[in-house]
Amino acid sequence: MSTRSVSSSSYRRMFGGSGTSSRPSSNRSYVTTSTRTYSLGSALRPSTSRSLYSSSPGGAYVTRSSAVRLRSSMPGVRLLQDSVDFSLADAINTEFKNTRTNEKVELQELNDRFANYIDKVRFLEQQNKILLAELEQLKGQGKSRLGDLYEEEMRELRRQVDQLTNDKARVEVERDNLAEDIMRLREKLQEEMLQREEAESTLQSFRQDVDNASLARLDLERKVESLQEEIAFLKKLHDEEIQELQAQIQEQHVQIDVDVSKPDLTAALRDVRQQYESVAAKNLQEAEEWYKSKFADLSEAANRNNDALRQAKQESNEYRRQVQSLTCEVDALKGTNESLERQMREMEENFALEAANYQDTIGRLQDEIQNMKEEMARHLREYQDLLNVKMALDIEIATYRKLLEGEESRISLPLPNFSSLNLRETNLESLPLVDTHSKRTLLIKTVETRDGQVINETSQHHDDLE
C-alpha cells in the first residue's frame, strides 16, 4: 500500500534496513510529508507516494510527495471534516469497503509502528539521560577528582623535592665542614710531623752529645786512673826517698854523735822533707781538685744530657701517640667522608629515580586527563548524534501525526487504539480540497533547518491534468 511504502521508505532513510534498527546522523534531518485524497466511485484507492531528499548548502531538505490520484464517478462530492454523509453509503461498493478494511489494517500497523517509535524515543531519551548523568559526573567528579589527585601528587612531589634539596644542602654543608676539618687536621699533621722530625734530629744530636760525653767521661776516667797510678808511683817514690833520707839521716846522726863538729844535716833533711811533703800535698790536692771538678762537670753534663734525652724520649713518645691518634682520627674522618659521599650519591640517584617516576606519573596523569577529555568529547558527539536522531524522529512522528489527523478529519471516524499512542500536541494541518477531476498533484515541500531548529518551510504545488 502507499502509506506503508511511505513509512517504510522514510524509516529506511532514517534508520536503514528494517524497522528495528537505527543509524544516527549528525548533520542531516529528514522530513517526509504525504498527502492523501480520495475520489468516490467504483475505484477509490490511494496512489503510491514517493519521498525524495537532497542536501543543500543551507541545510534544507526537499521532500516530494505525489498527490493521490483521484477517480470519481460522482463529481462534486467531498468528505467533510466534522461529519460523514451516510446517505452515500449505498454508493460505496465492495472495493471501497475493501479499501476501508485495508486502511484500518494500515492504520493499525501505523499505530504499532508509532508505538515502536515512541518506545524507541523513550529508550533514546533514557540513554540521553544516562549519558547526560555520566557527562555531568565526568564534568564534576572526574575533573575535581583528577584535579585534586594531580594537585595532591604535585604538592607531595614539591614537598619531597624541597626536603631532598634541604637534605642535599645540609649534606653539602657537612661535607664542606668535614673537608675543612680534614684540611686543618692534615695541616696539623704536617706540623706535628715537622716537629717530630725536628725532635728526632734534636734527639739525634743529643745522642751524639751523649756519645761524646760518654767518650769524654771514659777518657777522663782513664786520665784519672793514670793520675792515680802516677800519684801512687809518686807516693811510692816519695816513700822510698823518705826512707833513703831517713836512712841517710840516721847514718848522719850516728856520724853527728861521733863527730860533733860536722854540720846539722837533720834540720836540713827535715826542711827538705817538709818542702817535698808540702809540694807533694799541694800536687795531690790540686790533682784531686781537678779530678773532682772534671768529674763534677762530666756528671753534670751527663745528667743534663740524660735529662734532655729523657725529655726527648717523652716528647717523642707523646708525638708518636699524637700521630697515632691523629692518624686514627684522619682514617675515621676519611671513612665518614666516604660514607657521606656514598650517601650523597645514593640520595642523588634516588632523587633522580624519584624525579623520573614523578615525571612518569605526571605524564600518565596528563594522558589520563587527555583520555578523559577525548572520552567526554566522544560522549558529547554521541549525545549530539542522538539528539539529531531524536529530532529527526520527532519530525517524522509529527509528520505521521499530521497525516493521521488529516485522515481522521477526512473520514470523521474514530480510529481503533489511537488513544494509546500518547502523541505530543501539534498544530493540525488542514488538507487542501481536492477536485474530483482526474489529475495528478505534485507537492514539493522545502524545509530548512539549522542546529535542530526549523527556520524556513515552503511548499509548491504542480497540477498535471490527465
From Swiss-Prot:
Modified residues (Phosphotyrosine): 53, 61, 117
Residues recorded as bearing Phosphoserine in the entry: 5, 7-10, 25-26, 34, 39, 42, 47, 49, 51, 55-56, 66, 72-73, 83, 87, 144, 214, 226, 299, 325, 409, 412, 419-420, 430, 438, 459
An example Gene Ontology molecular-function term: RNA binding
Repressor is among the record's keywords: no
PANTHER family the UniProt entry points to: GLIAL FIBRILLARY ACIDIC PROTEIN (PTHR45652), VIMENTIN (PTHR45652:SF5)
Region (Tail): 408-466
Domain comment quoted from the record: The central alpha-helical coiled-coil IF rod domain mediates elementary homodimerization.
Post-translational modification: One of the most prominent phosphoproteins in various cells of mesenchymal origin. Phosphorylation is enhanced during cell division, at which time vimentin filaments are significantly reorganized. Phosphorylation by PKN1 inhibits the formation of filaments. Filament disassembly during mitosis is promoted by phosphorylation at Ser-55 as well as by nestin. Phosphorylated at Ser-56 by CDK5 during neutrophil secretion in the cytoplasm. Phosphorylated by STK33. Phosphorylated on tyrosine residues by SRMS. S-nitrosylation is induced by interferon-gamma and oxidatively-modified low-densitity lipoprotein (LDL(ox)) possibly implicating the iNOS-S100A8/9 transnitrosylase complex.
Gene: Vim
Glycosylation sites: 7, 33-34
GO biological process: astrocyte development; Bergmann glial cell differentiation; cellular response to fibroblast growth factor stimulus; cellular response to lipopolysaccharide; cellular response to muramyl dipeptide; cellular response to type II interferon; decidualization; fat cell differentiation
Region (Linker 1): 132-153
Modified residues (Phosphothreonine): 20, 426, 436, 446, 458
A Pfam match: Filament
Residue numbers of N6-acetyllysine PTMs: 120, 129, 139, 168, 188, 223, 235, 294, 373, 445
Keywords assigned by UniProt, alphabetized: Acetylation, Cell membrane, Coiled coil, Cytoplasm, Cytoskeleton, Glycoprotein, Intermediate filament, Isopeptide bond, Membrane, Nucleus, Phosphoprotein, S-nitrosylation, Ubl conjugation
Superkingdom of this protein's organism: Eukaryota
Chain positions covered by the region annotation Disordered: 1-33
GO cellular component terms attached to this protein's record: axon; cell body; cell leading edge; cell projection; cytoplasm; cytoskeleton; cytosol; intermediate filament
Region of interest: Coil 1B: 154-245
Biological source species: Rattus norvegicus
The protein, known as: Vimentin
Residues in cross-link Glycyl lysine isopeptide (Lys-Gly) (interchain with G-Cter in SUMO1): 445
Crosslink (Glycyl lysine isopeptide (Lys-Gly) (interchain with G-Cter in SUMO2)) position: 104, 120, 129, 139, 223, 262, 294, 313, 373, 439, 445
Domain IF rod span(s) in chain numbering: 103-411
Oligomer status and interactors: Homomer assembled from elementary dimers. Identified in complexes that contain VIM, EZR, AHNAK, BFSP1, BFSP2, ANK2, PLEC, PRX and spectrin. Interacts with BCAS3. Interacts with LGSN. Interacts with SYNM. Interacts (via rod region) with PLEC (via CH 1 domain). Interacts with STK33. Interacts with LARP6. Interacts with RAB8B. Interacts with TOR1A; the interaction associates TOR1A with the cytoskeleton. Interacts with TOR1AIP1. Interacts with TOR1AIP1. Interacts with DIAPH1. Interacts with EPPK1; interaction is dependent of higher-order structure of intermediate filament.
